[in-house]
Every structure is written in structure tokens, then in C-alpha cells.
């Protein structure tokens, strides 16, 4: 099957190159104006057009690689064309194929195909993207045809139920976006110790990267180290005493989570006293300030 794209952003351009690299036929990419195409992109062998009709005519599968809040708008435009028998896909992690409202009446088949990957730019290394999970949700009757198309790529591909999309996307956000917030709070604590931003991130990098690699090597339970794993309540209390209320909330919530892992690892140890310390810190946070 031949693939076309609407949207020449980071995801669209990266998938375009990646599909070509994996011998999937790509017809081109629609962009509203040629001015949206950078000089670097013009030097590549990508085909860009300002005609949706041309892309649709040449393509069996159309990827709407546009921001989430633009998918329904672009779809409303696409479905005014004759698209019977075509596969219409978007790449949103949070939205399901249902965002392609009324697709059954057009005779086309709707899918959400999401690469679980942080696209940093329009050029993504093939070997990096090859490690990403692709999730597929949508029309069951023609699912095998989409799976066959994607099987040209070396990625692991899984089917998702539409009702699981929000949890699936939340998992991705926990591992990616929220991890940024967590590192930012760690950086701010080092800022308070006199580190500038660069020095703070350089200090945190080997710790964070090594620990993250360890998690994926041995699993979350066996990767756990630190005061919670050692049942070191005094150190936990010192941390809570030293940080502001906003960071206490983060620290307490995540410490409760890793206590679950510690309890699995050390079933004969009671963590009730540590949980009590955390509960007290949260009670103090929720208490109104008295005049």
C-alpha cells in the first residue's frame, strides 16, 4: 500500500523518512504552503504538495500528522473528498480513531497509530525510532492490512482497545513529560545549593541515566536503592524538613509508590512508620495558614 501524509511537522517528516527507509512506498506530504518547507527539507527527496486531492488520489493510506487539536478540523476537510476504501490514520497518543467522526459513512477505515517516542525534530535517527513501540487502534475488519503495512518496520507493534487509550497515553506521559518535571525539581534543589542550571544538570545526568538504564535492565523492584529501600526514616524526615511544600507533595507521592516496591522486596519489614511520616507531612501541607 502507498502512504501519504498531511502535516510536515516533526512526526510527519520523521515517519516519512522512516517509512521510506523501511521500503514503504510514500507518495508525498501535503503542506498548506511551500513556505512551510525549510531549505534543508527541500534538499531531500521528499515530495511536498499543496494539493490534498493529489495526495489522496495517489495514496491508499493517509496519515494526519497534525497537532491533536487540529485532527478533527483536518478530517472534516479530508472527508469531503472521495475516500472510499482508504485508510485514514492519525498519530495522537491520547485520541482514538473515534475522533474521525462519521468515517463509516465515507467508506474509509479509521485508525490511531501512535509511535511511543519523543520526536525532537523533523530528522530522527532510524535506529532510535526503530526501538519505539507502535500502538494501533481502530477498524477491526481491516486491522490485518494495517498490521501488514507496519510489519515492514522492525518495531514492536501492539493493538489497543479504544477505552485503553487514555491510560496508555498517561503511562507515556508519566515516563516522559512528568520525568522532565521530576528532574526539574531536582535541579531546583541543587540551584538552592548554589549550582547553576548547567552544573546541576551535569551533576544529575549520570545518576538519572544510570538509574534509568538499571530500571530497564533489572526491573523497577530490583533497581530500587536509597533511604526507602534501606528503611531509613531519619533521612526521609530530613528531606521533608529541608524542602518546600510543592516538592514535599512530589516527594511524598513518589515515596509512597516506591514503598510498595520496598515492601515487595522486603516482605518481613514494616513500612508503617515511614508511611506515617509521609502522612504527617501532607497533613501539614493541607493545614490552612493561621494569622
Language model segments and positions:
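NAD(P)+-binding Rossmann beta1-loop-alpha1 motif at the extreme N-terminus of oxidoreductases
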Residues: 1-54
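Short, hydrophobic beta-strand segments that form beta-sheet elements in well-ordered domains
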Residues: 27-31, 88-91, 134-137
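Internal alpha-helical scaffold of NAD(P)-dependent oxidoreductase catalytic cores
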Residues: 40-43, 107, 124-217, 273
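Interdomain hinge/lid region at the active-site interface
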Residues: 213-270
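Conserved small/polar residues in nucleotide/adenosyl-binding loops
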Residues: 283-291
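Short, charged/polar "capping" segments at the starts of alpha-helices
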Residues: 35-39, 96-99, 141-144
Amino acid at each position: 500500500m502507498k502512504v501519504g501524509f498531511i502535516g510536515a511537522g516533526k512526526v510527519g517528516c520523521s515517519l516519512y523518512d522512516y517509512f521510506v527507509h523501511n521500503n514503504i512506498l510514500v507518495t508525498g506530504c501535503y503542506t498548506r504552503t511551500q513556505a512551510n518547507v525549510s531549505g534543508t527539507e527541500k534538499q531531500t527527496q521528499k515530495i511536498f504538495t499543496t494539493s490534498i486531492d493529489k495526495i489522496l488520489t495517489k495514496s491508499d493510506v493517509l496519515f494526519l500528522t497534525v497537532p491533536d487539536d487540529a485532527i478533527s478540523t483536518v478530517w472534516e476537510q479530508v472527508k469531503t473528498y472521495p475516500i472510499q476504501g482508504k485508510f485514514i490514520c492519525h498519530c495522537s497518543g491520547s485520541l482514538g480513531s473515534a475522533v474521525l467522526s462519521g468515517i463509516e459513512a465515507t467508506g474509509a477505515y479509521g485508525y490511531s497509530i501512535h509511535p511511543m517516542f519523543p520526536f525532537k525534530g523533523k530528522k530522527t535517527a532510524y535506529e532510535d525510532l526503530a526501538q519505539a513501540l507502535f500502538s494501533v487502534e481502530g477498524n477491526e475488519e481491516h486491522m490485518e492490512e494495517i498490521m501488514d503495512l507496519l510489519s515492514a518496520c522492525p518495531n514492536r507493534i501492539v493493538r489497543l482497545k479504544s477505552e485503553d487509550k487514555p491510560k496508555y497515553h498517561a503511562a507515556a506521559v508519566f515516563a516522559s513529560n512528568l520525568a522532565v518535571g521530576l528532574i526539574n525539581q531536582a535541579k531546583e534543589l541543587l540551584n538552592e545549593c548554589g549550582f547553576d542550571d548547567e552544573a546541576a544538570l551535569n551533576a544529575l545526568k549520570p545518576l538519572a541515566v544510570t538509574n534509568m538504564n538499571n530500571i530497564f535492565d533489572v526491573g523497577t523492584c530490583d533497581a530500587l536503592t536509597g533511604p526507602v529501600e534501606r528503611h531509613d526514616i531519619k533521612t526521609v524526615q530530613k528531606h521533608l524538613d529541608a524542602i518546600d511544600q510543592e516538592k514535599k507533595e512530589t516527594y511524598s507521592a513518589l515515596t509512597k509508590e516506591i514503598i510498595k516496591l520496598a515492601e515487595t522486596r522486603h516482605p518481613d519489614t514494616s513500612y508503617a512508620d515511614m508511611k506515617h511520616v509521609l502522612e504527617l507531612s501532607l497533613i501539614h501541607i493541607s493545614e490552612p495558614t493561621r494569622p
